[in-house]
Amino acid sequence: MLDTILAKVVGTQNERELKRLRPIVAEVNAFEPAIKALSDDQLRGKTAEFRQRVANGEMLDELLPEAFAVVREAGRRVLNMRHFDVQLIGGAVLHKGKIAEMKTGEGKTLVATLPAYLNALEGNGVHVVTVNDYLARRDSEWMGKIYRFLGMSVGVIQHDLVDAERQVAYASDITYGTNNEFGFDYLRDNMKFELAHYVQRGHQFAIVDEVDSILIDEARTPLIISGPAEESTDLYYEVDRIIPRLKAGEVIRGDAKAEEREALESTGDFIHDEKHKTVTLTETGIQKAEQMLAGRLNGGHLYDLENAHIKHHVDQALRAHVIFHRDVDYMVKEGEVVIVDEFTGRLMPGRRWSDGLHQAVEAKEKVKIERENQTLATVTFQNYFRKYKKLAGMTGTADTEAEEFNKIYKLDVVVIPPNRPLRRVENPDLVFRTETEKWDAIVTEIVDEHKKGRPVLVGTVSIEKSEKLSTMLDRRGLKRGTTTGGGADKHVVLNAKYHAQEAEFVAQAGRKGAVTIATNMAGRGTDILLGGNAEFMARQQCLAEQIAERLPKGEERFLEDEQFVYFFHIDAFYRVPKADYHRIFEHFRRQCEIEHEEVIALDGLHIVATERHEARRIDNQLRGRAGRQGDPGASRFYLSLEDDLMRIFGSDRISGLMQKLGMEEGVPIEHGMVTRAIERAQKQVESQNFSVRKHLLEYDDVMNKQRENIYALRRQILEGQIRLQDEDGQETALDTREYLIELAEDILDALIDTYAAKTADFEEWDLDALNREVTRVFGLDTGNFDFADQTSDEIRDTLWTKISESYDQKEKLVGREVLQRVERDIMLQIVDAQWKDHLYSLDHLKEGIGLRGYGQRDPLIEYKKESFALFQAMKERVDEEIVRYLWWLRPILNEEAPIARRPAARRPPPLILNDPGAESASVLGASRAQAPQASPFTRSQPQPQQQQQPPRVGGDDALPKTVRRDEPKVGRNDPCPCGSGKKYKKCHGAAA
């Protein structure tokens, strides 16, 4: 109530923000006459002038009005598109690092040119992020004309580019690409062995188109680069066979109380909770599963710790059979399970569910099971995009998620007013009792509107529902085809497989009499023009003429093949002479103008929504397809009490409301109270989904800090300067050799503290163990050392002299340059192998951490503690393995080297790894797809006294024994325990 009163008095926050931005628009408009008077060369020269002013210290905010005026004029000259005042406001919002909500058809693509140009003047690169390759390519070519006219370079990242092409694209002033490509390039860069092979050059400023889709809808799906694990696939088939023999219990709908849940458990072997999307074995189900899997279980019980992996397989098989449905959540294409995006309905080839779920679905569908993958690198979109120093976004629907944008990304949402008043009529929802009644009413509505000539766009929630509706329309005389409108009694269905073809269909959805069925988000990014899009129609005509000339007679069936038409289109279009194209275009332009007026007279595009989505934002996106730029239009949602949202989240409130209003068979209820009740249910779901995403982010933030630490270390190794912090937070940069010496000294100090400490009596020392550990870590033969009469400091000094001499000898024989390259490659491989194992450990930790809640402990706090302990242990292993590998290396003498591999004269001799164990693998003998060739390594036979194993990368041997001590270790850079305030190595550690 108070908020409403304040809003009336001082205006809403959005209104106040718009008020602050309007003077900027006035300044841009004031520059327009002078900028218009410039010649093309003078206008182009403004870019060099702006760059110089930035170099001289002028702020971008000061340049903004004039720079925006320059871009506006370039748009007018090159594209015949002049930025509206509201688009200037949108550009200013993006430049300030906020989200601009602009309705469909308001020209978001053109708006992005303003802040992209302005921020590119600094020379650090601007990334414009889109949802698919087609839009990235289209926008880079379309808007790229403005940038190139002004002397800026434009690049586009496509999924099939090689690294050299990606480097060129990222080196451009402005780079277009998809969220997936930007994220994967970041991960791939941090797996490379040469800085020169990196493709990205930093994360300065990103403008995210369809920001809600990328930062919210896809936030729960991390980007993962993985490699095959070794686990057999037999268990998936075995577990899958038992699921059909389990009896399904009653389905839990809504929130069930404990006693209700207990009663439901007696109805079958498993119960399905629709609201929380879980499926759980009951007591009888557990007993049956144990009987059927008796041969696999270690012991008698499925829930025993040693059977945890089998329990995991059973859980995933249940989810695959009960929760995941064919043609809704996935499709089977050419013997492969392909995921369907739950928000867009698009197929996502190449994407796989993790944790064995994808394999469980493959077993269910009786297709080949691909081996489970092990994660090599991963990042969520949330943490990737938070790397940018400045982030902005634009979409038609962000205000309903403003809280999430603010809390997760620190992004404010500003709603930009439309250039023309909205004329779309949003009709109240029609609610039916059953799904059958609803679908019959939808078909009748579509047929009736089509007879009038009014274009209809139907939004469905899944491919399955699209196909169902298409079949029903076929029966009513509206046949399925590859085109619609223009007087034909046909409809088209977007299967959301080819984005370019999808855009062509959506562009024609405004033609007179057109009927288009699409999943809710299909074709996003393409304007629906009333009367049709002449440019797209001209392309289609060119395609048809080329097909008529080149397609053999009798093969016309290929015209119904969407894949054939799509790939043929690109080649065919470029064969058409320009004069012919312009003639065809003019013909369709006149036709579209006539149809435009006819469709406006019919009240514009009519949106028919077949179901409410869990998020109001998705519903608003569908509504927003009608009524662009002041055009007329209408929308209506058709619902039934059997819809998922109504059944699961609507609770008894809506059902009670329906009874009060009275429901008869086939007669819908149309009432504002029902619509508001449904929106309340949607808000409840949105809140729940936000909590899930926030919860996942809190866990991922822990890994993100560790990932940044490891990636920073990798880069420092590549740069040859590794930075260490002292107790005062001061950084010291060490070259690779200095860093290795520091590590080796720390390890030796730890060994001395453990086995020959100053504070312990001689009788307590374990010199045999010290000798074994020194041999294990440094590869030294300590058999001739006699420490009997030496002090702790003298022992340390003797050992360090030998350790440092052995490394100096390597460097002397092979040269610093060769050894430095070997150091770098070995360090990188050890870091990568240990990081991979650490990710695996974190996955296992996360799986079971939720159980800590039963012990009255916060799982998140426990996860932070244990993951930190795992990370510290991993870093200790990395340090020790690096030292072990590099100290075990020794040069191959010419007489030892095989003739075929003997080094040429005057070349430094290559290095080998002492290999007492025949099964040990050289670090550089592993797969080196990402690594450059280094000095050759081979194996040598051990001397009789050498019984220690050299290190290995990966596997169990990658986890060498960590030195344990009763007292805390005093590092060389730690404060001295004597209390002097000096570093230990400058005080009592000086002699060491």
Annotate each language-model stretch with its function.
Residues K103, L110-A112, N119-G123, E895, ...:
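Conserved mid-sequence domains
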Residues M1-S640, L645-L657, Y711-A712:
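Conserved P-loop NTPase motor core
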Residues I35, V314, Y330-V338, T344-R352, ...:
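Extended, charged helical/alpha-beta scaffold domains that provide interaction surfaces
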Residues D966-K985, G989:
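Short Cys/His-rich zinc-binding micro-motifs
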Residues V458, I517, W835, F871, ...:
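Hydrophobic, well-ordered secondary-structure elements that form the walls
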Residues G453-T460, E464-S466, E719-Q721, Q725-D728, ...:
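Short, Lys/Glu-rich amphipathic helical modules
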Residues T962, A991-A992:
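Intrinsically disordered, low-complexity linkers and tails
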